[in-house]
Amino acid sequence: MTEEPLSAAWLTERTIYLLTLLREKRPLVHNITNLVVTNTTANALLALGASPAMVEGVEEVDSFARMADSLVINLGTMSSPRAAAMRLAMAAARQAGKPVVLDPVAVGALRYRTELARDLLEAKPHIVRGNASEIIALAGDGGGGRGVDSLVSSTAALEAASILARRTGGAVAVTGATDYVTDGTRLIGIANGHPMMTRVTGLGCTATALIGAFAAVEPDPLVAACAGLCATGLAGELAAIRADGPGSLQVEFLDALYALDSAILRDAARWVLP
């Protein structure tokens, strides 16, 4: 993990550096994601500068997870074969030393996926990204969610996030009106984003995938998560300026990711520091 002081200026410059590095290296991001967002996720990764792959067959995930630069696991649409593929891929990625990002969609609302998420947590993913209800439920403190929606503010989940981060040895991101990332010691808030983003399905899942892209080029999981959430939030803000509603927001979001650069980051990245 970095020993640099996490000032707002440092975080912005690090995000700029990582975005440049990501676009040079075009990391291969292995996604086992949900059926609702596969197209959106792949296009967002391409727009950012990464290379997406949606390999989920149990016959292929072991070898592909070792080949890829990072692995993103999303529990949005569950089935027994997908669960088996997730377990195989996570084990392979961990053995190969590749970063793993877990998105525990609807954990706390449905028992099967809650049990699966807790099993996957034992493999110690580098980064966990969820809404407040999901993070609280994953930490074992109940929930209050309605699937992908959260009835709890992101600040209410900070203690649970810290517990999870210490348990995994990685970072936990809690997304909401303000996003927060902690590794159990450090805490960073990201205040970028726009309310219209909640009217488009899958942008939270997309944020997880973008975190996976940054994790492929940044060894510090907290910094990788911060960079991914900042990029997502900024793209959402820029898209909302040009969009007439949720439909056009989806298109504008991809264009904004593609256009994201150092000038935009220096001008508009908003960090919330303790």
Curated annotation (Swiss-Prot):
Keyword Nucleotide-binding among record annotations: yes
Entry-linked CDD domains: THZ_kinase
EC numbers on record: 2.7.1.50
Origin organism lineage: Bacteria, Pseudomonadati, Pseudomonadota, Alphaproteobacteria, Acetobacterales
SUPFAM superfamilies: Ribokinase-like
Pfam families assigned: HK
Protein task: Catalyzes the phosphorylation of the hydroxyl group of 4-methyl-5-beta-hydroxyethylthiazole (THZ).
UniProt keyword list: ATP-binding, Kinase, Magnesium, Metal-binding, Nucleotide-binding, Thiamine biosynthesis, Transferase
Keyword Metal-binding: yes
Name assigned to this protein: Hydroxyethylthiazole kinase
Top-rank taxon: Bacteria
Cofactor(s) listed: Mg(2+)
Pathway: Cofactor biosynthesis; thiamine diphosphate biosynthesis; 4-methyl-5-(2-phosphoethyl)-thiazole from 5-(2-hydroxyethyl)-4-methylthiazole: step 1/1
Record-stated family: Belongs to the Thz kinase family.
Annotated residues for binding of substrate: 54, 202
